[in-house]
């Protein structure tokens, strides 16, 4: 669903910021 996709996007952003 949309929230699953949004969660994946947010996770990717947080992962990028963690670098």
UniProtKB/Swiss-Prot annotation:
One GO location term (cellular component): extracellular region
Statement: the UniProt record of this protein carries the keyword Secreted: yes
Domain of life: Eukaryota
One Gene Ontology term from the biological process aspect of the record: defense response to bacterium
Listed Pfam families: Antimicrobial20 (PF08256)
Keyword field: Amphibian defense peptide, Antibiotic, Antimicrobial, Secreted
Subcellular location: Secreted
Tissue: Expressed by the skin dorsal glands.
Main localization, broad class: secreted
Task performed by this protein: Shows a medium antibacterial activity against B.cereus, L.mesenteriodes and S.uberis.
Name listed for the protein in its UniProt record: Uperin-2.3
């Amino acid at each position: 669903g949309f929230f699953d996709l949004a969660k994946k996007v947010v996770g990717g952003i947080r992962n990028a910021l963690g670098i």
